[in-house]
Amino acid sequence: MHKIVFVTGNKGKFAEVRDILKNFGIEAIQNKDGYPELQEDELEPIAANGAQYVANKLNMPVMVDDSGIFINALNGFPGPYSRFVEDKLGNPKVLKLMEGEKDRSAYFKTVIGYCEPGQEPLVFPGVVEGKIAYEERGTGGFGYDPIFEYNGMTFGELGDEEKNKVSHRRRAVDNFLEWFIGGA
């Protein structure tokens, strides 16, 4: 069985990735050490830099995840600042920002960064399109899941198993697996 160190302090992210990888015979090992996060408007350089930093620090191959929700009516905000906005404002205030907005389209994006020590990092994006609900719905998932609607249900309503089949993180991990398994 392959083992991959996944660097995140986020229990929800780790559980989602762990559950996806185990279906492919890969064991995810959580490392909560973190890494210096670039302040960028795009997720790709953040994930690439983080993966390279940790791979060289730990001297082993690692995977990191940088994710965000991009709301079109807010010009892509909060995007790469999603965690900060979630911590400071939370879903109720994001919904308040959306009051009166007709365009509720949004997308979740995850970029998986993978790097081996001394190598250049690789990035694997995944996107899922949806819209911002008018209220929080569902108790599943984490973060923005209760306000992100996909095919009529929020990620918070879908439950982990269903969400893990269609999520942005799933799509990014699938892109990674296509490369990893194809090249293994």
Swiss-Prot record:
GO terms under cellular component: cytoplasm
Cofactor, free-text remark: Binds 1 Mg(2+) ion per subunit.
Cofactor requirements of the protein: Mg(2+)
Keyword Transcription assigned: no
Gene Ontology MF terms in the entry: dITP diphosphatase activity; ITP diphosphatase activity; metal ion binding; nucleotide binding; ribonucleoside triphosphate phosphatase activity; XTP diphosphatase activity
Known EC number: 3.6.1.66
Protein name: dITP/XTP pyrophosphatase
Source organism of this protein record: Methanosarcina mazei (strain ATCC BAA-159 / DSM 3647 / Goe1 / Go1 / JCM 11833 / OCM 88) (Methanosarcina frisia)
